[in-house]
Amino acid sequence: MNEIAQHTVLISGGAGSMGQLVTDYINSRDDFTMTAIHDPNYEGQEYKTYKTLTNIDEDIVIEFSPSSVINENIELLLNSNANLIIGSSGVNSEMISKLKTKTDRKIIVIPNFSIGSAYQKLFSTTLSENFYSVNITEKHHSNKQDAPSGTAIDLANTLPSNINSHEKDGDFYQINNVNKKNIYSLRDDKFLAEQQVDFVNEYESFNLDHKVYDRKAYLYGIKVVLDLYSDLEGFNLGLENIIAKKINI
């Protein structure tokens, strides 16, 4: 059996924008083979279709379903033998705990596949040692009604709880406070996905501004995970933890 046959892939949410991008990307590689899709909106015949996430034959399931169904899907996938790559910021803490117990296979949970977002989180963690105040502003397209974004919540919870927030002027879609951090949300079609982290101390400020202009930006993070797939073992959470060894901070 050759290397291609060793890595067959099912994409859950394969008819969505990211699912289609990832399908095309996997088809461009020699070491993974796209064989199946799970998505109620998929009407094609090129791939095997799964109505439910049961009796899975593929080696890997890449999960890109909406946050509204992601935890329900993972509950089903826990009963399979497939290795999992989960690309959602909507996985709840209970499901994370369950995933951690599956030590017999690869479980890779990546809330955000943007490499820029991963570096922003790493740098923010380091900056929090030298600044006493921080706030987060996240901007997304108008179709994203939930706020704050999962990426912003994840970052706020990662930063030390003893760092507070400063006020920010403006007309915002929502303002929330998570782990004592203010998160300011904007929704407008002039944005795809942006996040700014503003640090302040007594004498200076430092801003980390990250902007995604095209969903293809997420493919680089997927490339990183698939390139390192054979080396990753057990449970892995966050792209930043996978790439952290590349930089000394």
Predicted regions and their residues:
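Short, ordered loop/turn segments at secondary-structure junctions
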Residues: P40, S89-V91, N112-S114, K139-H141
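ADP-ribose/adenylate-binding Rossmann-like module
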Residues: L76-E94
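C-terminal substrate-binding/catalytic lobe of Rossmann-fold NAD(P)-dependent oxidoreductases
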Residues: N2-T52, S68, Y132-I249
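Alpha-helical segments flanking ligand/cofactor-binding loops in enzyme cores
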Residues: N71-E75, S97
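Rossmann-like NAD(P)-binding element
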Residues: N55-N71, N83
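Short, well-ordered coil/turn residues at beta-beta hairpins
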Residues: F64-S65, G87, N201
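Rossmann-fold NAD(P)-binding glycine/threonine-rich loop
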Residues: S88-I107, I115-A118, F123-T126
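Rossmann-fold dehydrogenase core element
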Residues: N83, K98-S114, F131-T137
